[in-house]
């Protein structure tokens, strides 16, 4: 026990670390290309190791107790009663769920069974997943992401874990693209809010081209900008507003903590978004990426 106590300590299994060190394909970039069971295997390995450490130390104490004189038994029993377990909370990164909500549920269930008590999930498209600090990220509409948050919650509840923790990460700040246009049934609903951030141009039916995707926004007919890859583009400068909406909806639909991924440490930017989030959810709690890929000294000096 390097810190002499495990109080407020935990293990965090990040996706980029698993991809780099635990994939059978060899070191991979942080793009969810590693086997989805790699994280499960590492959770089980670590959890078993920590339990074995407990068994070793407690076994030694009980042997001491059996062999001790009557006058020494009280102090040994006190050490047993106040024994601090090696087992600490394990936080597991499930990336974007490695598939749809059903796949997310099945993988989350395996992670929890292996020993995870907290699961982090992000709103990127699973098969377009990028490292949080890279460009070219693609997000999914809120309905898709909330379905995956619910899938993780169902996995916890099915296994009898009522206090399992879900961290909802938004990559919207650095994501300029979406895989699809959100389904919307009425003006102002969540799908409509998501689509309102799209980069569009007003058109009329006569100027529409064959194969164009057209939307009605208010009284206007608009054409969202679509790339040759069939991805749709958000308007520049909408990242912060999208992050705020992501966080509010995630917390309102099953997430316990929020994670706003940024390209560099920017305390004022994070603080501004949190103020807006807490106008709606006063007790919102943020986790932040203390990433080794950030040059913390340089950024704080700047």
Residue ranges and their predicted role:
Residues 1-302:
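Alpha/beta enzyme core
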């Amino acid at each position: 026990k390097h810190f002499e106590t495990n109080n407020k300590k935990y293990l965090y299994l990040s996706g980029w670390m698993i991809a780099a060190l635990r994939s059978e394909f060899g070191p991979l970039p942080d793009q969810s290309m590693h086997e989805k069971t790699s994280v499960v295997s590492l959770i089980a390995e670590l959890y078993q190791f920590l339990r074995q450490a407990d068994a070793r130390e407690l076994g030694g104490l009980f042997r001491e107790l059996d062999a001790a004189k009557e006058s020494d038994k009280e102090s040994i029993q006190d050490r047993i009663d106040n024994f601090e377990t090696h087992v600490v909370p394990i936080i597991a990164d499930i990336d974007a769920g490695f598939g749809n909500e059903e796949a997310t549920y099945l993988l989350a269930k395996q992670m929890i069974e292996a020993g995870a008590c907290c699961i982090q999930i992000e709103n990127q498209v699973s098969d377009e997943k990028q490292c949080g600090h890279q460009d070219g990220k693609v997000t999914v509409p809120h309905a898709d992401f909330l379905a995956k948050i619910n899938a993780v919650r169902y996995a916890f509840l099915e296994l009898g874990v009522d206090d399992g923790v879900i961290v909802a990460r938004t990559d919207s700040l650095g994501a300029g693209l979406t895989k699809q246009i959100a389904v919307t049934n009425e003006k102002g609903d969540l799908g409509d809010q998501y689509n309102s951030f799209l980069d569009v141009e007003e058109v009329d039916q006569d100027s529409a081209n064959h194969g164009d995707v057209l939307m009605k926004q208010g009284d206007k007919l608009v054409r969202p900008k679509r790339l040759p890859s069939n991805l749709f583009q958000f308007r520049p400068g909408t990242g912060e507003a999208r992050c705020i909406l992501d966080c509010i909806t995630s917390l309102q639909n099953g997430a316990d903590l929020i994670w706003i991924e940024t390209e560099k440490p920017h305390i004022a930017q994070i603080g501004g978004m949190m103020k807006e989030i807490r106008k709606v959810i006063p007790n919102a709690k943020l986790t932040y990426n203390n990433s080794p890929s950030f040059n913390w000294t340089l950024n704080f000096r700047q």
